[in-house]
Amino acid sequence: MSSFDPSLSTSGMRPPLASATAPSMADSLPSINFGFEELRSRMAQFTAQFDAFIERGRKQVLEERNQFKIGLAELQEDERMRQRDIEILNLKSQTHEQTLQKEAAEAAEMHAAVSSVTLERDSRLTKRDRLKQQIEETQKAINQKLEAQRSHSRYLDAQARLNVPELEFWQDYLCLRIEGAGREDRLKFVYSHLLEKDWEAEAWFELGTSSRDYEVFHSRPKLDREYLDRELDILNEDRDFGAFLKRMRRLFIEALK
């Protein structure tokens, strides 16, 4: 710091006082709008829409699952009835076989009745075969319906994962992409451009959405559980999903350093 020079304090060296109407240096600075309010608004809007999307998807999956269970119960009841028919048929068949044996023992004395009994037996065997064929066809139809239900459930799961509104903003803002995790109640969030020395390095975590409170099941690189639980507690309390994604990105950056 330079020392004070008394000669510079004389009125002759003092610059004239600034006019009251002269513009200040602060007035001449450019106005900067950082857009924090807009960003906060968009983050809140995204969080609300994301929660609504998760809730709608959960309700839809639960509704389809309930419908599937109802349909499955009906099919199982049909199968049970068919099984009972089979048991009745087997019982009738056993009774019939006993009748045939008795009639065969009397064949010498009742040769004339053998033809009639044989025809009756053949008729019943034909009827039994026809019933067996009907049972097989019914079982095949049940299996087809079950497969159709499973296929429909898989289709709904795929649609729910693909229908992700308002995520382009976060993908661009946080270098983030969202993928399916192989289950209907999980999403996989993948970050990139985390380190300046290696922009291709990626980090990800799987988020469970089956209940109101979110849960992280897996992450790579592995994050400290205490830090994860702290972030999840904040998210489940304030429901600010955008802020949670930003905090998770910071955790991965620290883990990769």
Curated annotation (Swiss-Prot):
Residues 1-12 have a biased composition (Polar residues). It is found in: Nucleus; Chromosome, Centromere, Kinetochore. Signal peptide: none annotated. Belongs to the SPC25 family. Component of the NDC80 complex, which consists of ndc80, nuf2, spc24 and spc25. Acts as a component of the essential kinetochore-associated NDC80 complex, which is required for chromosome segregation and spindle checkpoint activity. This is Probable kinetochore protein spc25. It comes from Emericella nidulans (strain FGSC A4 / ATCC 38163 / CBS 112.46 / NRRL 194 / M139). The lineage of its organism: Eukaryota, Fungi, Dikarya, Ascomycota, Pezizomycotina. The gene is spc25.
